[in-house]
Amino acid sequence: VHGGDNMAMYAWHQIPAVDMLFNTADQNSTQFGNIRAVKELRSIANQFGRVRTLSETYGAAGWELTFEDMKRNGDWEYVLGVNFMNQHLTYMNLTGDRKHDFPQGISYQTPWWKDYRVLNDYFARLSVALSSGEQVNDILILEPTTTTWMYYSPTKSHAQLAKIGESFHNFLSELEDYQVEYDLGAENTIKDFGAVAGNQFVINQRSYSTVVLPPTFENFDKKTFELVQTFLDNGGTIYCFGERPVYIDGKMDTRVAQISAHKNWHATKDVKDLISKIDLSEFLLHDPESVGGDLYHMRRELEDGQIVFLTNFSLTENSKGTFSMDGASVKVMDAFTGEARFHPTQAFEDRVDMSFDLPPAGSELLFVSNNVVPPTPPQPRVQFTEMSTEPSSIERVEPNFLTLDYIDLKVGDEKYEDIYFYTGGLKIWEAHGYPDNPWVSSVQWKSEWVKADTFGVGTGFEAHYPFPVGQGVDLSSLRAVVENPTLWEVQINGTTIKPIPGEWAIDHTWGVFDISSNVVIGENVISIFMRPMSIYAEIEPVYVIGNFDLEPQEQGWKLVPQTALETGSWKKQGLPFYAYDIRYSKKVDGLNGPVKVKLNAWEGTVASIFVNGEKAGIIGWQPYELDISEFVSAEENRIDVYVTGSFKNLLGPHHNVTRRGIVTPWSFKYAPEQQPQGTDYDLLDYGLMEDFDIFVSE
């Protein structure tokens, strides 16, 4: 799908908006890592005085999206120009196919929901800061949009079209590497709102002394060309990369060659050449090639100073260096706590020179004041040493889960054995006159599907979910979790059972059934009977919960006795589907002075830290440590680290996974014809792979 001109549409939005999907960072993708998409949004906001810029964020990233992913991706779009986030998405409930609708889901059902306020408050503060003041850039980059139109065909592709897109992506990426401040210009917007005022190229509320034609820019819209002519004659500066344009409105035109000979038209061979010719003093990064990581910045002008937001998009390298800009003093504004503190700088001739050191996925929000602020005494640098502690005791917080996603099905006179639940659902809907689950394949018009709930006698189906139980399992702990618990008859080994009043698991609308009295050692089956058929009867997995471990079989999994947990992957310790918290606990003698907890090798969406029963904070991103000084006691202390998993392992997808970071409804639709062996399920490693450490001051 090709959009004709995104920026042209943004010009008419009161809150320009973009949708950033997935959890990938390919430079040439249309999502995270695609600088152009967000810079278009921000540029139009600058040019039209729009205070807010909206992004729908995190959709289709999968249930496994971590706090570090969310912070990193959010920081990236905020530093490029977003300042208002609409998180994708909050499910009213997870029943049926809803849980497959481009997850992540953000609500009470999600295992990490209890810790999410930390991130929400962080982005709320960033939203305030980065919608304050104005971003004022002096350089305009013309987009090669009309050039791409020359190569576009609805019936066949042209290699040059992809080449232009890749070239422009790479060009913007290199500008960001050198921290060049610029806006993008859309020729369609220039047609309606462009002008020249003196030696300034104007788009509505913004004016630019420098215009850049990027590589592969081959065509001018007629109005743009006329403005460029006037701009050059009035003293404006054009930098042209590569071959000069040769077309106006898609036709060869010698006038382009004539203006390219103008004294203010400069042929430019590469970005380094451009850097040597333009003024970067507004934000001057020293020695950018040695900074490391993947650094971005945004600078916004206020009446009494400037806001600077720095982010490091890399997950593996620090970004470390120095920059200078106009100002007299600097404060760090902590977007996690709302506190501000003095930032040591070197001031000279109304400019400040400051250093930064951002860990992977790190960020820093600064206020550079025009006024001298008396410095506060620097905090003494604390030297930490690792405590010697006993190994953590480890405990599962919630019951273990088994996801049953293969069924035996009877619908009408047809019987099917060992088929994937979604395949079974298709057969049910087809038998009742639908090509697919109507809640999946279409959008209900008014009450269209609700009114279709008129199935007669003789319709319906029965689905059976088999599972084996080994010797020694704590049968008394076993429960079943079934969606829409009052919709159908539920049986365990032929005995009808009712949901436990007031109990739920995973989602408020899902029922919990006591199966402890009916489960036997050996083969068991949970059955659901739907007679007559209902429009609400979406076949989904059923879950067994309780105190057990799981052992992979040639087909699926077997319940076996629960064993003690150790550090290492949960899925290798009988918890392949477990989504919630595991508690790692240490008891240590009296602590005084600065103390911090540090996680070593670990996998999880987030970790919450408790000291003596009181929540001290969370660990979700590098450097994976937390100061717990104010929570420790001079007497014995109990330190608990709760590592949180995700719904990826519980809800899937478990079979049709082609790439991490992209999860769509189709990811859940396909699976092997018969249930594969347990080890073939696609599951993630969660847990502390190494014990956590406690550091105290020397």
Predicted feature residues:
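Carbohydrate-binding surfaces of carbohydrate-active enzymes
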Residues: 1-16, 20-479, 483-485, 490-538, ...
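C-terminal structured "cap/appendage" subdomains that terminate the fold
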Residues: 198-199, 214, 223-224, 254, ...
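Glycine/proline-rich low-complexity spacer/linker segments in large multi-domain proteins
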Residues: 372-391, 531-558, 645-696
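Hydrophobic core residues within well-ordered beta-strands of beta-rich domains
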Residues: 461-463, 544, 582-584, 688
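Extended, low-complexity, turn-rich repeat/linker tracts enriched in Gly/Pro/Ser/Thr and Asp/Glu
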Residues: 484-490, 601-608
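A conserved, well-ordered hydrophobic junction motif at loop->secondary-structure transitions
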Residues: 577, 581-585, 595-599
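A cytosolic small-molecule/anion-sensing beta-strand core signal
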Residues: 611
